[in-house]
Amino acid sequence: MAEAFEGHYDREIATPNLSPATRSASDATRERTMRIGGAMFFTDYSMSPTELARALEDRGFDSLWVPEHSHIPLTRKSPFPSGGDLPKKYYDVMDPFVVLGAAAAVTKTLLLGTGICLIAQRDPIQTAKQVASIDQVSGGRFLFGVGNGWNEDEMANHGTAFANRHKLARERVEAMKAIWTESKAEYHGEFVNFEPMMAWPKPVQKPHPPIIVGGAFPYGARRALRYGNGWMPHRSRTQYADVQALLPKFREMAAEAGRDPALVPITIWGARENLDLLKRDRDDGVSRLVISLDSGKADTILPELDRWATLIRQLGS
């Protein structure tokens, strides 16, 4: 019986015909039109995930992004990257995969992204299954935004040494790629190690959902080129114009790394309600902008989305 069961999985990984929504996720690098996504820290006092997801899709946004913090320790060895006190929503944010599963159930074309998933403090085998499951449930609409994190105390509670987080994250991404793409996967690294095993389902998108690596220039950009399918810098943590200056540097770095710059899309986190600035981003080759929404209710969020919907139409996104 065990041999028969094992033989059931001893097969090629199927490559299905992808839906238009899936193609837009997998082939984002080929899109010339800049997309606009929305992000929120979902809490028990914000709009619900289903409510916001429907509102975004109805208004022409291409994607919903959700962040991750498993908890916030009361000690603080590392400062908040954006400066000042840590906002309350960081303590209260919901689980990203639960949120995206709910959003997937009420939408048809909206892409669904983690922004970002803290892979340095996550088990790669369990996370690989969550990624594959949400990609299946959504019909291939998942975007895997990943990052290594900044909160040293939060990582420590997960058993992650802050000094090792970058190499650990890389190994975990490599291990997850093996799980997604191999019928019988194994991985042997310094921090991640497992013998041949089977893990299903596999993602709808082949070889796997796009891995969009968050992080500043130059180190985050290098990680994106090393194991990612796109780069996602955070505009609020640098001067607005500085991101523009970094785009040609990133493309030069991509070419030096043997990557076609045109096939490594750039998603910028942070945008202003200004058509001229949006056009500048579009003309500079930015693939997507993600706007950060407060953890508010519909009466405050929907008017903001309506203003953005007008800009999206004017932009032609």
Label every PLM stretch briefly.
Residues 1-11:
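Extreme N-terminal basic, low-complexity initiation segments
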Residues 6, 14-17, 23-317:
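Active-site-adjacent structural elements that line small-molecule/cofactor binding pockets in enzymes
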